[in-house]
Amino acid sequence: MIRVVLPHHLRTLAKVGDEVHVDLNGAVTAQVVIGALEDKYPMLRGTIREHKTLKRRPLVRFFACGEDISHEPPDAPLPDAIVKGEEPFFIMGAIAGG
């Protein structure tokens, strides 16, 4: 079971609490986690990554074990602590403005 923490606006859209869980078999990567999340909560499609390219949206960041992994390859394996459910995979909305 992978634990995922979503930003407030996506929790509201998906009508979920602070943390959601996805069950995965095989390799655990950011791409696989996001795909499982979008399958479980279809209303999130296009909010985290682009519809056609499946690339991360510019103002969305991914964190694993306290590290920003947003610019890592999306098919890179996530840390064991995420895979074992000891730590959550964080999806954060970046703050921008002037």
Regions found by a protein language model. Name each.
Residues M1-G97:
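Ubiquitin-like/PB1-type beta-grasp interaction modules and other compact soluble beta-rich domains
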